Amino acid sequence: MLFAACLLAIALAPSARASDPDAQRWKREAAAVTIVRDDWGIAHVRGKRDADAVFGMAYAQAEDDFNRIETNYLTSLGRLAEAEGESALWQDLRQRLFIDPAILKADYARSPSWLKALMDAWADGLNAYLAAHPEVHPRVITHFEPWMALSFSEGSIGGDIERVSTKDLQAFYGNDPAGALAQFVPPSSWAEPSGSNGIAIAPKLTANGHALLLINPHTSFFFRSELQMSSDEGLDAYGAVTWGQFFIYQGFNKHIGWMHTSTGADVVDEFAETIQRKGGKLFYRYGDALRPVTTREISLAVRQADRSRVERRFTVYATHHGPVVRNEGGKWIAVALMNTPLPALQQSWLRTKANDLAAYMKVAEFKANSSNNTIYADDKGNIAYLHPQFIPKRNDRFDYTKPVDGGDPATDWQGLLPLDKAPHLLNPPTGWIFNTNDWPYSAAGPDSPKQADYPRYMDTVGENPRGLHATRVLTGRRDFTLASLIDAAFDPYLPAFARQLPILIADYDALPASDSRKRRLAGPIALLRGWDYRWGITSMPTSLAVFWGDILWDKASKLDTAEGLSIYDVMAEKAGPTARLDALAEAADRLEQDFGSWGVPWGEVNRFQRVDGAIKQAFDDAKPSIPVPFTSSRWGSLASFGAHRWPGTKRYYGTSGNSFVAVVEFGDKVHARAITAGGESGDPASKHFNDEAERYTTGNLREVYFWPEELKGHVERSYHPDVP
């Protein structure tokens, strides 16, 4: 692979001054916007036009955490190495295989006028903020251009691209297999399951006859802000906004609510290409013909310790299936995924303005959501489940969970499936719908879609413990309220341990009396034997079970087992008594070493800490933290707290899981309660940096001030954006 480097003496440029036309335009936009901060620091942005609201919300987001906005765009544009150096090089190359600034600029140029106006206003809001705040020093992006919004247009594209291994890219394009192997891979137990919980309850199962919606994304902490944006053009949406995007990603408006959960549908495929070289050129076999391999040059700037930058140049390859990402067994592997930023941005925005199910489904016809299921509820009493709208039609005789033969035309994608050909639900007789990143075939209990009716590629993950838990808390209830839906979302039962621990206890009981482990493990086994599988701050069994589970998880993930088994099946059926008992001994030893006893309350171990505004926190046992009762979602907890030990710590500190959580009631007037991890501001000096932490850890959701009369009496500040 071609790979060259040359030094560029590029100093970090200071923020540019606003030109007179810019400043005049910003003043007009700012005058049309009012930002109201409530007593939690949450921005309620009102504009005359939709574009004015976008200007104001971009400005408000920048006030709260500009660093996260810039970092998200450095990532989405493939420019992170300009700020973070060599460690981000292969991540940038991965992004640039799919995201081409020239194409995004062309997409912007052909955008409908209404969308151009939104992108223009978004860039204006961020640039006006930088001009008004010279004390803020961007790491790289000193001026935002409207087309950049298309690089971060939907929740799907980033997650899909991230399936490509940077280790494989380094081995292939860097011609550096040894360096690729040296990339740090954390233990599998550190990887918190990505995704979310969504639940919709029909009016017939609620106390007051109103549909209810649970919005419970599991993301890295502080990944999204919470705000409201409204206009005189019909916009009035509230919810979670990923830093730097200009649409409510998960939330609600006056009439409808939508919750996205990461899907198990197969929408990213790999094609094994047979490569031939003829006349100094590269070709790949397709049917009986040879097609030329497409090549293009990508240049990436990489920051050095002296603040200069090195330019790295790559020649990258693609077939009609997509970019080539690795060599496997002599075949080049090309990746196919959704890459339609213009329709994606339109769908992401327009669904926030939909006022009923028909309007929402019309927007879904953009088919530009690939990685998310949707749980929906509205004020007409409808509840619904949607599978991703971007689902390629394929020949189901091929196993697309593995690379398929790219030379066989029968493996090609055959367009996109109509929405009604994917699993979906509307007002099932059960009266409830959920998704926990599991398959759709249990979403409404006995009224769920039937697996036999759909191709295999509609799901690759099967059931999970959270799905079993959701079914448990929903079944048989007919009196749901906002409060009881919150209780369900924070129900402490851990179904994974309810399956795994009886097997461990049986292993122990089967030991002969002469086995040394019989005495050594008697106390820990007694503690676990009497447990009700419920987490809690004072629960000692939770600590022991989680330590045991994490150790066994890492061991089980390395076992060479038959395909088709989940990690839970491997732990229960393949790990064996010795591995399970040894993991318990190791867990007890670790607790004794770190905490002085194997009987330690879970709240002493599991902590929430936010002491600075860094995107990657450095945790410290000596600094303030608060106990968290809920566990990782891998054990079936609906409320998720992805935590583990960090360098220099004994305690577990969380970085992902419950982030923004909301429950919404669709009555005559929409009513909601919500919570955000930590607080709204990324500034440690702000009183809203960590003011929600205790409520977050206890599930004590606060009232949402959606209506003007609800906001009245809770206003800290009302202002127009300050522009130079």
Task: Enumerate the language-model features and the residues they cover.
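Bacterial N-terminal signal peptides
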Residues: 2-11
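Acidic, low-complexity N-terminal propeptides/linkers enriched in Ser/Thr/Asp/Gly that mediate export
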Residues: 115-214, 219-220, 367, 379-383, ...
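Substrate-recognition/specificity elements adjacent to catalytic centers across diverse enzyme folds
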Residues: 20-225, 232-234, 239-247, 252, ...
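N-terminal leader/propeptide and maturation segments of large enzyme subunits in energy/redox metabolism
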Residues: 84-119, 123-135, 304, 327-328, ...
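Proteins synthesized as precursors that undergo proteolytic processing into mature forms
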Residues: 344-372, 379-380, 450-505
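Hydrophobic alpha-helical segments
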Residues: 239, 268, 369-477, 552
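Boundary at the C-terminal end of the N-terminal hydrophobic targeting segment
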Residues: 16-18
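Glycine- and hydrophobic-rich flexible loops that cap the catalytic core of alpha/beta enzyme folds
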Residues: 234-245, 251-256, 260-404
